[in-house]
Amino acid sequence: MERMKKILIAGAMTLLMLCPAKAQIAWQQVEPGVWKGVVGTPEEYSLLGVAGVTPQKEGFARLPEVTLPQLANEIVGSIQDGKTSLRIPLQRKEQLYGFGLNFQTVHQRGKILNLHVDHYGGRDNGRTHAPVPFYISSSGYGVLINSARYLTVYAGSGARKDSPNAPVAKDRNLDKTWTSAPYSDAVSILVPAPGAEIYLFAGPTPMDVVRRYNLLCGGGTLPPRWGLGFTQRTKKLYTAEDVKNEADEFEQRGFPLDFIGLEPGWQSKAYPCTFEWDATRYPDPAGFVKDMLAKGVRINLWTNPYVSPDSKIYKEMYPVSGSHTVWCGIVPDLAGEKARKIWMDKLEQEHVNIGVSGYKVDEVDGYDRYVWPDVATFPSGIAAEQMRQTYGLWVQRTTAELYKKRNQRTFGLVRASNAGATSFPYVIYNDYYSHPDFITALINSGFSGVLWTPEVRSSSSSEDWLRRFQSVVFSPMAMINAWASGTKPWTFPEVENQIKEYAMLRMQMMPYWYSEFARYHFDGIPPFRAMNLEPGFNPEQGTTAKLSDANLEDNPYLEAVSKEIKDQYMAGEYLLVAPMFKGQKERTVVLPKGDWYDFYTGKYVGNGEKITVTPGLDRIPVYVKDGAILPFMEARLHAPKAGEKVNLEIRHYGKADGSYRLYDDDGETFDYEKGAYSWLSLIHI
């Protein structure tokens, strides 16, 4: 009998070990409207830790006071087999946004996502350049999982049998409301680690949630003023003379140009890289950079971080690199201080000290076929998947610190990022080239604290060329990337004048763009964002399918898809931009509540309604809120220098009174962090 008791006790203990222990989460407030909870034992290596975030505390004071969201008490976590699962409740008709840089969808409820840094492959499945594990609810809260692992997210997919909202079984033979995706009342997230750190953000609005996230991550980047001008990336094997001639041609043709990007041929070896100048194409790098600066044009350098055996730092870097190579180049273990210092010193010595203004850091995302495998090891002890998830953060942080210590701002490009990168001076790009999907990515970037450029590379027609250019001037970085095509703004002579008009418009609007990035930094408001964050926006007006025949209570995902607006967005405080794509003659635009006016003519266009417009080839639809005040400067070819005065033209739209806060600082240094900046109130009564 005693032996039987022992067996029973042992059996009970085994069952307890097999069954995951579920528990509510204790929440600790870390910033106003932001709470942190812990399940199990989270790994020390995390996204926010790698990003080295310092919250922008002053910005929180300008947000509404809030209390812990009620759903906090319903969030549960459990640990089984060394993995952590989290369950966050959902309400009917609640919509989800975010989960990183998606290219084809804005609404994420109903998705199954594997959040994994990778080059985007044409499907919104979680594998993307910035798989940020942060989402925003239409109910006015947000959730961030601070883990550097590959996460699996069931964003309202999967129904528990013990749920009080469990769907009812239906007979597919006879019931037309049967669906293959029954109603799910929760987001479930699997973290492959024995613990997880979860952040909960209160609103009350979705925009407030986004702002709190951005402020927690240090506030948005404030680029140098020249970074908001126009940039051209040259062909791969251009020489110093080729670059100078191209800059001269921009000047002669009257096209603006603030910085030029040099592609792989500037290096003595690339793929993998030496980080050293090619002596035949650039015999005098310092003189070349100096000459370009004298023309008012800065230099940005392409690179990837993989070290060639021919690089002078190869031997020193070898012991602090990973076990596997990329294109036969070693991979610096940037999680280790020594590898970072070796790389930083090399970049500083070869580039920054002679006046190079920034970097384009390529191929830190994937593809799997060439990047290190998940079996790779690194001297720091960081797992290969964690390094994959954070390598984009490391290259941004490392290069940004190079300029920060010189009190010099930079603005560049990167192909991978993740949570915590909001304050880094980098814009994401890729090798994909769908114009409509590029706009959807621009829309989604505002949910995740990253920036994206719908860059122009090449086109098969003058129409496509112009349409892409019209879009890119209303984005974080106005750029032609001609590394392979050799295209220039005037490549299609039949639309050269229209291209020039939009290029000059970009320059004229620099006071507006600069002020909007200041709001991004100080207040966390993304300068380019989805309509879903705009007050008074009603996606019902964007319905593209009849819903009367659908049982939306059982299939809310159908409702979400039918109301998705993914081809128009807000640019700054006042502008609604609706791009046109090749072959389009007309399009619909959904206007939020309030009077809206045509950006070009000032004419009234509508209020809280869906309109159909036929703008012609010379224009894309851009609309302005009633009462808006927009600051313009005179058209010019280069951004103003520090201390340079410019004449402003102030435009007021509509009939309502309005105001605008115009931001100013030296445009080049970090002195604004010490209070060296000003806001000027522009008021129309």
Question: What annotation goes with each model-predicted range?
Answer:
Residues 1-7:
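Positively charged n-region of N-terminal signal peptides that target proteins for export
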Residues 2, 143, 212-214, 317, ...:
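Generic hydrophobic, helix-prone segments enriched in Leu/Val/Ile
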Residues 10-17:
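Bacterial N-terminal signal peptides
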Residues 19-23:
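Sec/Tat signal peptide C-region and signal peptidase I cleavage site
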Residues 24-618, 664-669:
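Catalytic-domain carbohydrate-binding cleft regions of carbohydrate-active enzymes
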Residues 624-682:
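Accessory, solvent-exposed terminal regions and/or long lumenal/extracellular loops of proteins
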